[in-house]
Amino acid sequence: IPSREKYTDLKEKFIFPGIVDMRVFVGEPGYEYKENFRTLSNAALAGGVTSVVTMPNTSPVIDNVSMVDFLKRRGRDKSKINIFPTASLTKGLEGTNMNEFGLLNKKGIIGYTDGTQTIQNTRLMSRIMRSAFDLDALVIQHAEDNELSKDGQVNDGIIATKLGLQGIPDYAEKIIIERDLTLLEDFNCRYHIAQISSEKSVEIIKNRKEIVKFTTGVSINNLSLNQNDIGDFRTFLKLSPPLRTEEDRLSLIKGINQNLIDVIVSDHKPEDEESKRLTFSQAATGASGIETLLPLALELFHNGSIKLSKIIECMTCN
């Protein structure tokens, strides 16, 4: 009787845990023409991603109990992967009125963020942190000063000058991080910087890690690419935060290796073709990335930039 057991030769192979991607934008509800739960889960599984943390930047915004119920139901019915939703820090992502963390916590929300928006008002941010501490809620901040990054398209510097585009300075990121970590000394809530992009930010984190408790993420785009890859107006590399210098990229890799950066994400934000086939300044910001997260990370391993064990840690132990 032939055996029904099947054997697979795994010599010189790795068994990689399912990846947890902590920064994913799904188009449902409101932008299904860009992405829905079915297409998201297919792309995720193709890239080895089994769990995603979704951002609240939908239409309507995920900022109330009914929208959370809808999102979880759609994820359960249409997705083949684990969906962990976040809700917005402020009502309607407007950066004005703080959301109701207590009610949303009961619905299983794992964290609060305004996604691509930054809490600009310092007084509001202090209230958010105080409430988050009281309710053990996780605050996730996209660090970028709006006034300094207004109308910005690419990293501020030689590429911006060459292409004739408005630049986004690295200190636009630095200022928000410094402000929030200063507030964190008093309020001590659970706090996560969604993604950093510059050497200056790495230095701040290095100096503050022993003072306050927080975590930090980085996009695989900023680990693998630099501003030169934009070339002649490649709109699919119009990202937020922008790709910066090679020195910044190497500093981010160093931050991973020195345990200063905790999480590697895809920053998966698919846009439809019509939104990208425009001039660079008019094109939408964002790119699909969930399928390429693992291949790009493994390239960093193969070229000796980051150990495989560290990549696994940053992409599965979130």
Question: What is each stretch, according to the model?
Answer:
Residues 1-2:
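N-terminal metal-binding scaffold of metallo-dependent hydrolase/deaminase domains
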Residues 16, 65-86, 130-141, 290-296:
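Alpha-helix-loop-beta-strand connector modules within alpha/beta enzyme cores
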Residues 12, 23, 44, 48, ...:
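Divalent metal-coordination and catalytic microenvironments
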Residues 22-35, 56-58, 84-97, 116, ...:
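Active-site mouth loops of central-metabolism enzymes
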Residues 162-188, 257-258, 263, 269-318:
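His/Asp/Glu-enriched, well-ordered alpha-helical/loop segment
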Residues 11-75:
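Metal-associated gating/positioning segment near the N- to mid-region
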Residues 99-264:
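Histidine/acidic residue-rich metal-binding segments in metalloenzymes
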Residues 33-43, 93-104, 179:
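Short, acidic/polar
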